[in-house]
């Protein structure tokens, strides 16, 4: 395993830890989720290029499409919550409240 793969894997782990530690604000959770998607994209692209998988060459593009949809939904949810409650705390997203 080369140093590039280890660095990308560490970037994914750091984003995952950031998601677990800074989960009180929605904006920080969205940024950590985008970091995870970026590291997954780079890792999948490098694996496909190094191993010459021609059949899986569309996989990074599909991952980018899902990441863009996730970012759009996350930002719209952030705008809705901040307009409704005035802050971006994740505790405001509890759907079981009356």
From Swiss-Prot:
Molecular-function GO term, any one: NADH dehydrogenase (ubiquinone) activity
Record field: catalytic activity: a ubiquinone + NADH + 5 H(+)(in) = a ubiquinol + NAD(+) + 4 H(+)(out)
Signal sequence segment: none
Classification via Pfam families: Oxidored_q2 (PF00420)
Keyword Metal-binding listed: no
Biological process terms in GO annotation: ATP synthesis coupled electron transport
Transmembrane segments: 1-21, 29-49, 61-81
UniProt topology in membrane: Multi-pass membrane protein
Enzyme Commission code(s) on record: 7.1.1.2
GO CC field: mitochondrial inner membrane; respiratory chain complex I
Main location: mitochondrion
Keywords tagged on the record: Electron transport, Membrane, Mitochondrion, Mitochondrion inner membrane, NAD, Respiratory chain, Translocase, Transmembrane, Transmembrane helix, Transport, Ubiquinone
Superkingdom of origin: Eukaryota
Places the protein is found: Mitochondrion inner membrane
PANTHER family: NADH-UBIQUINONE OXIDOREDUCTASE CHAIN 4L, NADH-UBIQUINONE OXIDOREDUCTASE SUBUNIT ND4L
Subunit structure: Core subunit of respiratory chain NADH dehydrogenase (Complex I) which is composed of 45 different subunits.
Function: Core subunit of the mitochondrial membrane respiratory chain NADH dehydrogenase (Complex I) which catalyzes electron transfer from NADH through the respiratory chain, using ubiquinone as an electron acceptor. Part of the enzyme membrane arm which is embedded in the lipid bilayer and involved in proton translocation.
Family: Belongs to the complex I subunit 4L family.
Listed name of the protein: NADH-ubiquinone oxidoreductase chain 4L
Record gene name: MT-ND4L
